Regions:
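Short helix-capping/linker turns of helical repeat alpha-solenoids
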Residues: 38-41, 54, 59-60, 80-83, ...
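Alpha-helical segment of the N-proximal tetratricopeptide repeat
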Residues: 7-27, 226
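TPR/TPR-like (Sel1-like) alpha-helical repeat modules
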Residues: 71-78, 356, 379-396
Length: 416
């Protein structure tokens, strides 16, 4: 690792971590690949993190996940002389004795000191790495210390408390400097503490997501907006969902669409809600809520021309691909009446069996299926009539009941 980060690594950190809204994540990824191939160990280290998924890099970059390649890159970064790579490999459990032997440093402390120097100069990624070294107790291996290094358990515990607590300041520096992930560890530090060494301080965690939202982090804007939505502070929630969506950040357009569809914090605009659901699916094709929302819109013909085939497609996708039972009533109607899909009473009954709330039309459909023995079920007129009666004032149920009568012996039969 050089005394300073290369211009390539600095630029990549800006576009990948510190200012994700530049939209240059892919270019930064390619820049790191080129620098890594040219021998830049820090580039290899950051590139490895980019391949480790949304827990380590903003999901909006849509980088590929490749744990095997990430591991190779971490090992490579150590061999290339990156002190940053040494600490990240240590944190990742990849600094095996054989890998450690390949680093050009006399000790882990020497590598730590190099990264700490860059952290003190203001680099947020290095600040985050240093914070993690304290937070996850990596300092024990770095300093080559353990409980046997102290004359008593009390002194060892005091040492642990002093070292662990150093993470707080480093995480705050990283958080304010552009690494939104630092807030995750701050939240854990404040809400859970650390064993019986660091006491929880939950009051310090309550504004973390608000601060992150105000700092412009899309992920925190979404989290904060979700909290506001739960508190029914809908106008504020809508503002932050819109801010996050502009990044762009996944799931936000669904939330915005939901609020416009239901008039939460804004006047109802179902056409705009539909456009929001469509924007969400363009970003995240598997978004369950947007499939359900579009399915409902197409079924009802609200905000969009009625189209049962599209309704059935979207609702079926959410049900079959995502395991969502939200739209089972609509799916049952499609199958029962043959709307947008061939009529299939058997499938209709499967969906109706999942309608576990009071619904008169659902009871009507169940009643018809059982009374007439449709969809492969044996005719059971008494059961069917019971459902039809349960449907109460539903007009079709009242009409269907006219086809049945009770005999003198109290048995329900179909009228001739």
């Amino acid at each position: 690792m050089a005394a300073v980060l290369s211009s390539e690594v600095k630029q990549a950190l800006q576009d990948i971590y510190y200012n994700v809204r530049t939209g240059r994540g892919r270019e930064a990824f390619a820049l790191l690949e080129k620098a890594s191939a040219a021998g830049d160990g820090d580039a290899s280290c950051v590139l490895a993190r980019c391949l480790c998924g949304y827990q380590y890099v903003w999901g909006g970059h849509d980088f590929p996940e490749d744990d095997a390649r990430a591991t190779k890159l971490l090992h490579k970064s150590v061999e290339q002389g990156s002190a940053l790579g040494v600490l990240v490999a240590l944190r990742s459990g990849e600094l095996t004795p054989s890998v450690q032997k390949k680093m050009p440093f006399g000790s882990l402390q020497e590598a730590f000191d190099q990264v700490e120097a860059l952290a003190k100069e203001g680099d947020a990624f290095c600040q985050y790495v240093i914070g993690n070294s304290y937070f996850w107790w990596d300092f024990l291996r770095i300093q080559n210390k353990g409980k046997d290094s102290f004359p008593s358990q009390a002194e060892f515990k005091a040492y642990l408390k002093e070292e662990i607590s150093k993470c707080e300041d480093w995480f705050w520096k990283a958080f304010r400097g552009g690494v939104h992930f630092a807030a995750n560890n701050l939240n854990r530090y404040y809400t859970q503490g650390d064993e019986d060494i660091i006491a929880p301080q939950p009051e310090k965690a309550k504004d973390l997501w608000k601060i992150g939202a105000e700092l412009g982090y899309p992920s925190h804007q979404f989290i904060y907006a979700s909290e506001l939505k739960k508190q029914e502070r809908y106008q504020e929630a809508l503002h932050w969902f819109m801010e996050s969506a502009a990044a762009p950040n996944s799931d936000c357009w669904y939330e915005i669409g939901f609020m416009y569809w239901n008039g939460k914090g804004v006047e109802v605009d179902k056409a705009y809600a539909v456009s929001c659901y469509e924007k969400e699916l363009a970003l995240t094709p598997h978004n369950t809520g947007s499939h359900n929302g579009l399915g409902q819109a197409y079924f009802l013909g609200e905000g969009v021309p009625q189209d049962y085939a599209k309704a059935f497609y979207h609702l079926s996708y959410a049900y079959e691909k995502r395991g969502s039972e939200w739209g089972v009533f609509y799916l049952a109607k499609c199958c029962f009446y043959g709307l947008g899909t061939p009529q299939d009473y058997g499938k209709a009954l499967q969906f109706l069996n999942k309608v576990d709330w009071q619904n008169k039309e659902a009871d009507y459909m169940r009643g018809v299926i059982y009374a007439q023995g449709l969809g492969g079920v044996s005719a059971d007129i008494p059961k069917g009539v019971a459902y039809l009666q349960k449907a109460g004032s539903f007009t079709k149920a009242k009409e269907e009941l006219l086809h049945y009568k009770k005999t003198l012996f109290g048995k329900w039969v179909r009228r001739n």
